[in-house]
Amino acid sequence: MTSTSGSGRDFGELRRVVVKVGSGIIAPAGRLDPPVIERIAQDVTTLRDKGLEVVLVVSGAVAAGYLGMGSDRLPVSVVERQAAAAVGQYQLMTMFASVFEERATVVAQLLMMQDDIEDRRRFLSARHTLQELLSRGIL
């Protein structure tokens, strides 16, 4: 398959792309930026419409969650960061699920840590899960 982006870029035989979005993009100043997330959803949808499988990797749960915890500063301790991530992860998934639902796209999340990559059994399990999601058209 040959695909091109809106900029005319030729994707050649590319089948799958990984889009990485960091906290500085989606949660500047500790708040999720809905217009930015909307734009990401549109761009991802455009890629999918061109026949590409898209894996969206999003960081930013800590940045999105610390204000929701009532804090006015980024968390420093491991416990604070984990609590902020727990709050922020829900906010991220809620917002992404909403913007992609408008585009008839189901989203899923895989939460992974370094140990999941280093342990062969856990890595293979995550890979098989991702392959199953992609085969069903789930983002």
Segment roles from a protein language model:
Residues M1-L139:
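Nucleotide/pyrophosphate-binding catalytic subdomain
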